[in-house]
Amino acid sequence: MIDFRPFYQQIATTNLSAWLETLPLQLKQWEKTTHGDYAKWAKIVDFMPNSTACINLKDKVESIPHTPLSVGETKQLTHHLKQLMPWRKGPYHLHGIHIDTEWRSDFKWDRVLPHLAPLKDRTILDVGCGSGYHMWRMVGEGAKMVVGIDPTELFLCQFEVVRKLLGNDRRANLIPLGIEQMQPLAAFDTVFSMGVLYHRKSPLDHLSQLKAQLVKGGELVLETLVIDGDVNTCLVPADRYAKMKNVYFIPSIDCLINWLEKVGFKNVRCVDQAVTTLEEQRKTDWLENESLVDFLDPNDHSKTIEGYPAPKRAVILANA
């Protein structure tokens, strides 16, 4: 099983120390209600060697072992990594193995990074972090500490496997909770929420929860689905959106800016818009499920299969 005690020790003397009032008990309770396959996934983490490797986190997430793996070792490692499918966010280049994930998350990072306040020496929270790809890219930009939160047990095990293959780097940590379970810490210099807001039944509550984690003046990086329209435009899908049942609100950019200002954010601005392409989200050998092409109208890729506008994403920056 995953041992969170090193993280507790790590934050004990930082401005995150107040989290220790609630976090250990929350994670003990979490361990009692984990997914039925969690024990199997955690064993794969235990199997992974604590290897020494040359690490590149600046323009990709890559580990090159000082001693190259044999053909047999590569085959065995690939087998274990495949046991943790589906791999959704990446890609990873680990010990000579290319995990070609469903999402080219590096595309998103390249769109977001040029607009950010420098991440060097910052304490960062990544909400809905998935398997942690963007967390490692934040570390590559010099972040002092990156904490990701995501309640999905598979993502936790994927993250811990990657961590081991990156030499057990402790600058990034994944905590399997949702932001609604976090006490207001007001301790993070930058908070990321990318691909989360439209899954929330109460988007303004989510924005308020993000603000409660930021230091005064800290930067919010919000990436979410948007639609065209004015300040009063917001799509509420009747049932599914792109085959997803848990999509509740897709605002226009002006509507989203209004929401952010309403909960107290300042200096709110949109820095990027991009329609999701079939190059950025697609089926690979590391994903057995459907992907974007299956979610779009086969005769008109400007629409979802339900007839809504196809996914378009915006990046919004704001300050607490």
UniProtKB/Swiss-Prot annotation:
GO MF term set: methyltransferase activity; transferase activity, transferring alkyl or aryl (other than methyl) groups
Chemical reaction(s) catalysed: carboxy-S-adenosyl-L-methionine + 5-hydroxyuridine(34) in tRNA = 5-carboxymethoxyuridine(34) in tRNA + S-adenosyl-L-homocysteine + H(+)
Binding site for carboxy-S-adenosyl-L-methionine: 89, 103, 108, 128, 150-152, 179-180, 194, 198, 313
Pfam families named among the record's database cross-references: Methyltransf_9
UniProt record, GO biological process: tRNA wobble uridine modification
E.C. no: 2.5.1.-
Record's keyword annotation contains Thylakoid: no
Family matches, as CDD domains: AdoMet_MTases
Stretches of the chain forming a coiled coil according to its record: none
Top-level class of the enzyme under EC nomenclature: transferase
Keywords assigned: Transferase, tRNA processing
Entry keyword Ubl conjugation: no
Function: Catalyzes carboxymethyl transfer from carboxy-S-adenosyl-L-methionine (Cx-SAM) to 5-hydroxyuridine (ho5U) to form 5-carboxymethoxyuridine (cmo5U) at position 34 in tRNAs.
Recorded family membership: Belongs to the class I-like SAM-binding methyltransferase superfamily. CmoB family.
HAMAP family listed in its UniProt record: tRNA_carboxymethyltr_CmoB
Subunit structure: Homotetramer.
Protein name (database record): tRNA U34 carboxymethyltransferase
The organism of origin for this protein: Actinobacillus pleuropneumoniae serotype 5b (strain L20)
Name of the coding gene: cmoB
